[in-house]
């Protein structure tokens, strides 16, 4: 069995500053790039499939050459066998639709059709959640979203998934789909390794991946638009039908503090402060 996990590099909003140009496009400046945190459940799902069903795991991303570090991190997370980076200027500034076209073409260009493609439910910089479903549409594959648990039957060529019903976090439905299929994981996804052999396989794969991740560039294939035979008019900024009408900062609510002024020279008031602090600290 072969799986592909899609991941993306996003600005580390804890470090540096980002801005937007006059067309509403994100300018990262010197802000560091990190792996999209919402991709982690997808990586866990792919790792579970590899441990329990065998086969190979690949990771694919679209972005600038600097995304190699993001792919290395993903390789360590999913114990990936190989990496794919889709990268050139023609692909830059793509919206979700142009991204989906590019990524779907990259998947179709692989030497072997994968059985499963995994994606996180949204990116930290875009927040739309469109790219995964749109990529599934371009591939013309079954799509299962909000997945929290997964079992794959390679002999039957099917997957059985538990998914959260949108709008009701307490309701879970079980669905079945034929392979190949596209899976969008929910943040609540947790892998399951019920058998001892699965846990041993997990340990062995971790040891194998340590050396491979240290030489991740030797296991990375980089494709530009010409390698994928993509028309520049249908990818990147030129192929993006989305128009950003404006970008507005989210106003921060004013901090509310319920403060009490005390006289530090008044023993009774200070004793009251000590009592109050003791209550918060778990005292009597």
Language-model region placement:
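Structural beta-sheet core signal
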Residues: 5, 59-61, 85, 119, ...
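Short glycine/serine/threonine-rich phosphate/pyrophosphate-binding segments
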Residues: 13-15, 39-43, 67-69, 125-131
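A glycine-rich helix N-cap at a beta->alpha junction
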Residues: 69-102, 106
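N-terminal beta-strand-loop-alpha-helix module at the start
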Residues: 1-62
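Electrostatically charged, flexible surface regions
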Residues: 149-284
